[in-house]
Amino acid sequence: MSKVLFIKASPLPNEVSRSSQVAETFMEEYKAKNPSDTVEELVLYNTEVPLLDLELMTAGRELQAGKAFTDLAPEVQQRLNAYNALTDQFLAADKYVFVFPLWNLGIPPLLKAYVDTFVIAGKSFRYTEHGPEALLKDKKAILIHGSGGIYSAGQTSSFTHGEPYLRTILQFIGIEVAPTIFVEGIDHNPSKEAEIVAAAKAVAHESVAEF
């Protein structure tokens, strides 16, 4: 039995977000084929995702120096608890499904803040004399990525830092990343929206078998 963490990184409701619609299709198919697995849904825009800032970095250094957690300011304790809860939740999962849009050639800022909660030296990777070593080597992920333009291939593929970044950072910590499901090009061809979404859903159905 596997534990699946379904991470939604769009503030838009499902009826508006085409990538979320495709992700729901993927999850429905996955649950049907893997009834014994457990699925936990994490909606980032409905979740407190603490930003890794000076306050948290200072608190981390103080704790490493021996300061008691209870001696931190109450609001700092609360932020650290929220941060650590996200870390623990991520590390406890076996599989990850990320659905996210392309914003200005990158990922949403809240998704980047979330990435910082689990890419942590000593937890998801470690430094050795031979370089960094991944610690999450028996886990899998799949990315479902929406964009108004087409960035998965062609001349514009070199412009985007969204899907390549998330894929690379997950591989860096040892996670095997399946081929991405792209939901793209609707802003270029609005009249083909239904066709594009249907094609992406077909890929989603096929992708479940290998996940």
Name the predicted role of every residue range.
Residues K3, T38, K139-A141, V177:
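Residues at the starts of beta-strands that form the adenosine-phosphate
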Residues A93-D94, D138, I175:
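Short, well-ordered alpha-helix to beta-strand connector turns
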Residues P11-N14, G149-I150, D187-H188:
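Short histidine/acidic/glycine/proline-rich micro-motifs that form metal-
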Residues M1-F100, L105-P109, A113-D116, I120, ...:
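N-terminal beta1-alpha1-beta2 submodule of the flavodoxin-like/Rossmannoid cofactor-binding fold
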Residues E28, A153-F211:
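Glycine-rich phosphate/pyrophosphate-binding loop and the adjoining helix
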Residues F118-P132:
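Short, acidic/small-residue loops that bind anionic groups at enzyme active sites
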Residues A9, G146, V183:
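Cofactor-binding loop segments of dinucleotide-utilizing enzymes, especially the Rossmann-like FAD-
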Residues T128-F172:
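Short, glycine-/small-residue-rich phosphate/pyrophosphate-handling segment
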